[in-house]
Amino acid sequence: MASSASARTPAGKRVINQEELRRLMKEKQRLSTSRKRIESPFAKYNRLGQLSCALCNTPVKSELLWQTHVLGKQHREKVAELKGAKEASQGSSASSAPHSVKRKAPDADDQDVKRAKATLVPQVQPSTSAWTTNFDKIGKEFIRATPSKPSGLSLLPDYEDEEEEEEEEEGDGERKRGDASKPLSDAQGKEHSVSSSREVTSSVLPNDFFSTNPPKAPIIPHSGSIEKAEIHEKVVERRENTAEALPEGFFDDPEVDARVRKVDAPKDQMDKEWDEFQKAMRQVNTISEAIVAEEDEEGRLDRQIGEIDEQIECYRRVEKLRNRQDEIKNKLKEILTIKELQKKEEENADSDDEGELQDLLSQDWRVKGALL
């Protein structure tokens, strides 16, 4: 009976294990950290919710250290490299656009000259192949006789020479085949065609077509700018070389020496170093503060877990004391019930003795055999 009473627990009470409590605390901590997610294009979370930097490809221990990682030297160098590559790509695209614009003007002039020549040539072209070859020879001799110009349009006669040479080769092949079949008739036809071609050219072509002074080609607008840029670059390189050639301390005045050598003055250099030192110290302080904050957070969690363990132990002791109290109460109840039963039995026995005594006393003692 005592064992059954000790096995019973009070109704409506739930006993929490230490492992379950630890699991609940870790889950609560995970939920609190998940709410503070870093919103940054370089922040990346994996399936387990661990934070890492996508640019540096390095894991970050917690969200508290993200700002420290961003202010770090490695992350800033990666960001600077990314910005430099982006600016270089933009600069190359911007430099290629003006170059294509500058090349449009000579191409348009070339097309205009080609169209003018194409309109003039079909007007004087006869039906015979011999006349075309002679006219090509005359045009070729004229082009060779004209002096070449250094402008961009001086390339046009060379292009026309190639076309005329191809036409001349085709005409020579036709002429050779014609000479093999009809030598005499072709010779007479050639003389007649040459004379007729000269008459046609003299009648159709203008008077100043074969002038000795051809029109000057327009000057390309960007040629002078390129030369000026080259001269400016040479001057800058010479100046830089002369400044670098001077040794340190060439001038007595340190400020003049620094200005000529194109370096920072000693005072400015000291201020710059002091600013860099302060910046580095601030970064170190922020890192140390973040580390201290993380350690404090871990210590606080450890203290909370320790306090919870102590509370669990106290609850266990209270439960033990309550169980012991229940056991003692049950024992007392059993003892009291036993005593009450004993009293009842004694009372019953006393009442039986008294009844017998009364019976004896009520009988007549003088009667024979009354006490038997």
Curated annotation (Swiss-Prot):
InterPro entries: Matrin/U1-like-C_Znf_C2H2, ZNF830-like, Znf_C2H2_sf, Znf_C2H2_type
Region described as Disordered: 78-126, 143-225
Pfam families: zf-met, ZNF380_CC
Keywords, ordered alphabetically: Acetylation, Cell cycle, Cell division, Chromosome, Coiled coil, Developmental protein, Metal-binding, Mitosis, mRNA processing, mRNA splicing, Nucleus, Phosphoprotein, Spliceosome, Zinc, Zinc-finger
Claim: Zinc is one of the keywords in the record: yes
Modified positions (Phosphoserine) in chain numbering: 225, 351, 362
Biased composition (Acidic residues): 158-172
Posttranslational mods: Phosphorylated in response to DNA damage by the cell cycle checkpoint kinases ATR/ATM.
BP-aspect Gene Ontology terms: blastocyst growth; cell division; chromosome organization; intestinal epithelial structure maintenance; mitotic DNA damage checkpoint signaling; mitotic DNA replication checkpoint signaling; mRNA processing; negative regulation of apoptotic process
Residues forming coiled coils: 312-349
Main location: nucleus
Top-level lineage group: Eukaryota
Zn-finger segments (C2H2-type): 53-75
One cellular-component annotation, GO: nuclear speck
Annotated Low complexity bias: 87-99, 194-204
Reported function: May play a role in pre-mRNA splicing as component of the spliceosome. Acts as an important regulator of the cell cycle that participates in the maintenance of genome integrity. During cell cycle progression in embryonic fibroblast, prevents replication fork collapse, double-strand break formation and cell cycle checkpoint activation. Controls mitotic cell cycle progression and cell survival in rapidly proliferating intestinal epithelium and embryonic stem cells. During the embryo preimplantation, controls different aspects of M phase.
PANTHER family: ZINC FINGER PROTEIN 830
Subunit description: Component of the XAB2 complex, a multimeric protein complex composed of XAB2, PRPF19, AQR, ZNF830, ISY1, and PPIE; this complex binds preferentially to RNA. Interacts with XAB2. Identified in a pentameric intron-binding (IB) complex composed of AQR, XAB2, ISY1, ZNF830 and PPIE that is incorporated into the spliceosome as a preassembled complex. The IB complex does not contain PRPF19.
Name this protein carries in UniProt: Zinc finger protein 830
Organism: Homo sapiens (Human)
Organism classification: Eukaryota, Metazoa, Chordata, Craniata, Vertebrata
Protein encoded by which gene: ZNF830
